[in-house]
């Protein structure tokens, strides 16, 4: 993909940029059988309480049903088109199987209309194919990785992400993730060969607040600008937060505090934690 930079014809256009969408298939239409209605929540739960701040509004969207499991083995599918998905940063590819079945999958970089893709242990390790980690050569870049066999891909699904298969031992495979974390996953788990497309997404500049609102993002108000009833940093005369370390509205440490569960089952699968810009190499949970 490429990025198109706008001319500074107004304050909102200055420094703004947008994808050129050249990787998309011209003239495609979304597959209606794979579309579902998407209800907006505004960041509220079933009690009407805000559980995710700064959410609300945005353009109306329809959800695209993505095949994250890719268990239709032994059949060669044809990429009908590469399409835009408003629900994620990556592009999606529409696969057509010989029996007429159609599936959406995350489109790796380099996949285009007309390509042939396969799933299963007998598939060749080429970009776009999905196969178990035990059948993938060491050093290969992979994406859309399962953490439990048959549960579907959960890691490396956003634009431009990829992991590297570093080693295999017994029934486990060792992966270097984009964050720098090294993690073990069962070698029976599946992954897609290649890097997720739309890698320049991180370089796009929205340019104005309105484009954030189109995406359903509401303003992020500072705690020091609030009243004491609304935030621990609120109130006071002038710009002061009462001598307190930065915290969230609920009082949790906002800069570097651990929020991960200490006894989370997947902690045992982490070989090396990521490197933090602030604290350097992080230690494993004990």
UniProtKB/Swiss-Prot annotation:
Endpoints of the signal sequence: none
Ranges of biased composition (kind: Basic and acidic residues): 230-240
GO annotation, cellular component aspect: large ribosomal subunit
Gene3D superfamilies recorded: 2.30.30.30, Nucleic acid-binding proteins, Ribosomal protein L2, domain 3
Gene Ontology BP terms: cytoplasmic translation
Region (Disordered): 22-59, 215-286
UniProt keyword annotations, A-Z: Ribonucleoprotein, Ribosomal protein, RNA-binding, rRNA-binding
Pfam families (alphabetical): Ribosomal_L2, Ribosomal_L2_C
Biased composition (Basic residues): 255-286
Molecular function, one GO term: rRNA binding
NCBIfam families documented for this protein: rplB_bact (TIGR01171)
Subunit architecture: Part of the 50S ribosomal subunit. Forms a bridge to the 30S subunit in the 70S ribosome.
Chain's role: One of the primary rRNA binding proteins. Required for association of the 30S and 50S subunits to form the 70S ribosome, for tRNA binding and peptide bond formation. It has been suggested to have peptidyltransferase activity; this is somewhat controversial. Makes several contacts with the 16S rRNA in the 70S ribosome.
Family of this protein: Belongs to the universal ribosomal protein uL2 family.
Record's protein name: Large ribosomal subunit protein uL2
Source species: Rhodopirellula baltica (strain DSM 10527 / NCIMB 13988 / SH1)
Taxonomic path: Bacteria, Pseudomonadati, Planctomycetota, Planctomycetia, Pirellulales
Gene: rplB
């Amino acid at each position: 993909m490429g990025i198109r930079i706008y001319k500074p014809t107004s304050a909102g256009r200055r420094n703004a940029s947008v994808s050129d969408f050249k990787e998309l298939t011209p003239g495609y239409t979304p597959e209606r059988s794979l579309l579902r209605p998407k209800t907006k929540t505004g960041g509220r739960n079933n009690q009407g309480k805000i559980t995710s701040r700064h959410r609300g509004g945005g353009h109306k969207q329809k959800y695209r049903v993505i095949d994250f499991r890719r268990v239709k083995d032994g059949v060669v599918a044809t990429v009908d088109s590469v399409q835009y998905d408003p629900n994620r940063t990556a592009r999606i590819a529409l696969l057509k199987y010989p029996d007429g079945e159609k599936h959406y999958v995350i489109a790796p970089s380099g996949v285009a209309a007309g390509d042939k893709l396969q799933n299963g242990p007998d598939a060749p390790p080429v970009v776009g194919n999905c196969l178990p980690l035990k059948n993938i050569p060491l050093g290969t870049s992979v994406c859309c990785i399962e953490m439990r066999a048959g549960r579907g891909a959960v890691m490396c699904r956003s634009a431009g992400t990829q992991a590297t298969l570093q080693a295999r031992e017994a029934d486990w495979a060792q992966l270097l993730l984009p964050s720098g974390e090294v993690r073990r996953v069962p070698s029976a788990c599946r992954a897609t060969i290649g890097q997720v497309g739309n890698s320049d997404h991180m370089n796009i500049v929205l340019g104005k607040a309105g484009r954030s609102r189109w995406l359903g993002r509401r303003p992020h108000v500072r705690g020091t600008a609030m009243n004491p009833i609304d935030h621990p940093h609120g109130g006071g005369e002038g710009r002061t937060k009462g001598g307190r370390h930065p915290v969230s509205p609920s009082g949790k440490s906002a800069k570097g505090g651990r929020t991960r569960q200490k006894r989370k089952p997947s902690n045992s699968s982490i070989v090396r934690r990521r490197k933090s810009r602030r604290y350097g190499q992080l230690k494993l949970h004990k």
